[in-house]
């Protein structure tokens, strides 16, 4: 991966930012740094918590020491974090993300309709119907009949998709609620004024922001460019490195 990113021998004193999940161990973090060093001995590799990069990309003024609340929903995990400036105050990593949502839809459609779906078809249903919350509607999809093993066209209801996603969405909402229940008083005003900001590909799920807002009890919004939020934040950190602490650095 580091070679694909362009961190290879021959570059002149390259610098890079490597974003790591909040749940990454010290061993995993050191291994990443060592891998970067092995590819380019004079490389300046900077490890940064993914939630810090997401918050920077979401427009939080971390340089001013502001408090921030970020929910980063990726393919495999969801990162929920409270930050003060460039420091992670509290974070939680969930094994729930866009892939788990797709799998839940695949399983629900097979159980209810006897139809085998591919991941792309499940993803299309997810993005088109989302969290319908009782709104009637359906979408046509094509899969394989589980019994006959032949192609079949089927209408999938919005209710079925929303029901399939309920477990994943509830887990994210519970994590947000738990994080807010233990927020330091000195950060409360910043978090309320800055709102819960949702990033990552999973943020594009229709209806998700309103569900998170209901769980949080404070306003929530999807950032302007959720798919590139972490990358944009990493670029910001690379350009203004001194403003942001390295991953795992004590905040005191």
Regions found by a protein language model. Give the residues of each.
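Nucleotide/phosphate-binding catalytic cleft detector across ATP-hydrolyzing
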Residues: 1-70, 83-197, 203-252
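Short acidic, Gly/Ser-rich segments with clustered Asp/Glu that frequently serve as metal-coordination loops
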Residues: 75-77
